[in-house]
Amino acid sequence: MAAHAAAAPADTPVPAPVPASEARAGKDTDPAVRVLPTVDVSGSANAGWRARSASVTGRDDASILDTPASVTVVSAARIADQQARTLADVLRNDASINADYTPVGYYGNFTIRGFPLDPASAIRLDGLTLSGEQNVALENKERVEILKGLAAIDSGVLSPGGIVNFVSKRPENVSSVTAGVDSRGSTSAAVDLGRRFGPDKQFGFRINAAKENLHSYVDDANGRRSFASLAADWNITPRASLQVNAEFQQWIQRSVSGYQLLGGTVVPPAASASKLLGVQPWAKPVTTDALNLNARFDYAFNDDWRAYVTGGRSRTMIDDNVAFAYGCAYVPSCGAGGTSPFFFASNGDFDVYDYRSPGEYRRNDEVRAALAGKFSTGALRHDVLFGVGALHRVVRLSTSVYDYVGSENIYGPDLSFDPSPNSASQSYPQLDAWQVSLFASDKISLGEHWQVLAGGRQVLLRQRAWTSQDGEPTRTDRSKFLPQLALVYKPAAPLTFYGSYSKDLSLGDQAPVRASNAYAFLPPLESNAYEVGAKYDWANRLTLTAAAFTISKPFEFAQPDSTDAGYTFVQRGRERHDGIELGASGRLTERLSLNATLAAIRARAYDSGTPAYEGHQVINVPALRATLNADYAVPGLPGFDLLGGLEYSASRTANEEGSARVPGWIVVNAGARYSTKLGGHRVTARLWVDNLFNRYYWRDAGELQGDAYLFIGAPRTARFSVTYDF
């Protein structure tokens, strides 16, 4: 109930895919014809998993090696090899990213460098902000880009952790069908169909569609989804191009409640990964309808100057239903030992609530225009970007049903209760927010070895927020200049050192229902980020990265006090995260490609006025995390690759006081890919096994709206798919 209560293939003898830019332009097309903007993910036939460029920083096709920020790119090929179904699966490739309340059957929430991502602003599609309250489909995505820490120059109001950007596949001549199955009985089918046509191949379209029957490892939590998308391109002239994208997905699945600490201090021992807490026969599934639209027009004035205008709409409609397991206020055992009613009782008793919130409506409308150019002033070379953007965010919610219906025990049998007789009210506006930003940056080259990046954005935020249907809105008006500065030193072409500073503005959180100021929106808060790093391109085959960072922002938490509620949600003190990241991505040998990441983060709260919340790691942020994924082309077996993965997480705190911890864990994944030709058509079979050794572990100890929840990781699951190109 989230807002409920309260690959580029590795080196093999198989020919590598034609880079997207070549596939669209065609080797025999007029070289003067300008094709639509692209990002080279695979780089060359032997580049393995090494991305060369990304657009998530706000500059199209920016070289990752020369960018003074930490960027991760996960290609469509790796997504396919790992049989990823959701963003949560994709983000497991980076150690700096963690699940932060990601229940089965609902959209996921995540942290980057320990800071929660705001789904209203930190999730993007083709550079435009999505309504992130959705599980974005992956069938039509060319790659997923992650920017850590430093915000993109064209961002508006944004959480300090970073940005996740989905990049859509562009039209090219492609025809393929994919069928898949997993060991739990899930089945899926997908089609990918694209063509370029016209006298100069100036027109193009690409259609993706998918249907999936979802069988969860949690009992009674099965579901289904349907997806369709269209991408269209038009190279209007050699200098002008237009692209349009539309996608729709419906996801219907029962949502799974998380466990809570027993007595507020103990991680539930021997808890079942397959038990649907509070399951009731009358509980309906959650239905999420997501529609994402965008368009972009590019115009090149000459080789040095170009402009673009882009805009989009992202809309989600959620019928949120769940028999929600929460707290123990209605059971006698709750008072034993002074247990807070906001946790499960010490013996495992918990309350069940009939929660219904139909017609949750969230919409992001965004438009942006920018001018980019290059010029020289004496010995200085300038690469400039100027732009303006506007984002309108609308949220409408109903007065939900949230009624107690009975109590159960996590170790006991499932019990049936009568649903609440009450009905939800009609929806009302909860949020109406405008963000307008002016941004500019100049990358100045000082000779051959030094670059200075200076820029910033002026952000105007105007927001109205309602806490009840009949109440007066809380108004927020804020104007702030947010600078970005970076210094880059390149002693040699393959080596980059950098240091950067940025200031960001993010929206304040909403107080949880249990606080004395329930539902109140806290004011916007400013964060500061410092980062130094190094990047090395070894032998044009392996990219090595290292970064150290410090990010701080006001600490938001439910502060114990003498009010009737016992807590007030406040901003007080600072929360600072200091960390080191290491990474390696690319081709280690002629046959072995890998992606390895490591993140060590020290996350602390200071000057909060609540000593129990200080002096230890912030909730759900592991001090050390690492990932390793590899692709090995087996000699003597053309087209056959062995795949493997490893994820490690240190233990993490599970409550604000730091008195409870979930243990660390190691999960091993394995798979294989075989690609051959049958009758002149490419056929690719993929096998991937998550959690190969069936490790029992707590994958998520996240906090939502002031309450802490625990989710058990999925047991061993095998997925198999076959793709046929025709």
What are these regions (language model features)?
Residues I252-G263, V394-R396, R462, L487-E531, ...:
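Surface-exposed extracellular loop regions of Gram-negative outer-membrane beta-barrel proteins
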Residues N235, R362, L380-R393, P429-K553, ...:
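Structural signature of Gram-negative outer-membrane beta-barrels, strongest in the C-terminal barrel
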Residues P31, L36-V177, V532:
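Acidic, small-polar-rich N-terminal luminal/periplasmic segments of exported/outer-membrane proteins
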Residues E212-S216, S229-N235, R239-A300, R313-R362, ...:
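Acidic/polar loop-and-plug regions of large Gram-negative outer-membrane beta-barrel proteins
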Residues E360, V384, Y530, I619-F726:
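Conserved C-terminal beta-signal and adjacent last beta-strands/turns
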Residues D298-A300, R306-G312, T316-F324, F497-Y498, ...:
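Membrane-embedded beta-barrel scaffold of Gram-negative outer-membrane proteins
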Residues H449, T550-S552, V570-E656, T723-D725:
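Gram-negative outer-membrane beta-barrel transporters
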